[in-house]
Structures are given as structure tokens and as C-alpha cells.
């Protein structure tokens, strides 16, 4: 039988140390490790969205995608310095921005600027960030 700490542990990549580390933080819910992991995935999303943005010919959609992608990352970073409801609100703003970014990517696909294959990585990362933000805002009850 797995111990309680083992059942709730997971690995998190720590870029400053350049290694995967085992985290004993709860898999879901707020913890420094989970918030850091969310920020790392958001950084990956911002990197992956750039080639998609560059293909979008409509300036309004491109600019909105740029703004909301950056908003996701910056609001997660700002949540790190907050406590209580203010932290939850920042996660909520980041989640809303991630959902906007997702719709902007789907619009770019619908309008023929990028294919689903070209946008697959960005959509996958956005989906992951949204799921993490929901769990950071609304941790599961034991």
C-alpha cells in the first residue's frame, strides 16, 4: 500500500535547478510547487503561441492573442505575491485570459490562418493551464 505522501507526490521540472524534482505537495490545490508548475506550463504556452501568432494575418486577433497570452503568465506571477481571495481572483483572471486565448486560436483556425495541427501544442498547453488554474482556485476537498 502506498504511503499517503507517496500517493500525493508528483514530479515538477525546476528550470533554475535544471532538473525534475519530486514534490510532496498535494497534486491538486494551492501549493508553492503546484503554482510554480502552472507558471512553467504558462511560459511554455507563451513560447508555443508565438509561431501561431505570427501566422495570423488579422491584426485584431493577433494582438488580442498576444495580450491574453501574456495576461495568463503575468496574473499567475502576480498571484504568487497575493494571499487569500486576492490570490484566487488573480488565478480567475488568468483562467479567463487562457480561455480567451483558446478562443482566439480557434478563431485563427476557423479563418484559415493556421491548421489544427499547427495549433495543437498551444491548445494542449492552454487546456493544461486552464485545468491547473481551476484546481488552484477550487482545490478538491478531502
Q: Residues of each region from the PLM?
A:
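Amphipathic alpha-helical assembly/interaction segments
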Residues: 1-142
Amino acid at each position: 500500500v502506498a504511503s499517503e505522501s507517496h500517493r500525493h507526490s508528483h514530479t515538477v521540472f525546476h528550470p533554475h535547478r535544471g532538473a525534475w524534482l519530486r514534490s510532496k505537495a498535494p497534486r491538486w490545490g494551492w501549493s508553492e510547487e503546484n503554482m510554480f508548475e502552472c507558471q512553467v506550463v504558462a511560459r511554455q504556452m507563451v513560447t508555443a503561441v508565438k509561431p501561431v501568432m505570427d501566422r495570423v494575418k488579422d491584426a485584431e486577433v493577433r494582438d488580442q492573442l498576444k495580450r491574453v497570452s501574456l495576461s495568463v503568465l503575468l496574473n499567475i506571477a502576480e498571484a504568487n505575491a497575493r494571499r487569500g481571495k486576492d490570490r484566487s481572483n488573480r488565478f480567475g483572471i488568468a483562467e479567463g485570459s487562457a480561455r480567451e486565448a483558446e478562443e482566439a486560436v480557434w478563431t485563427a483556425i476557423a479563418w484559415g490562418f493556421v491548421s489544427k495541427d499547427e495549433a495543437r501544442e498551444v491548445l494542449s498547453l492552454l487546456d493544461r493551464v486552464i485545468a491547473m488554474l481551476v484546481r488552484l482556485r477550487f482545490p478538491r476537498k478531502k
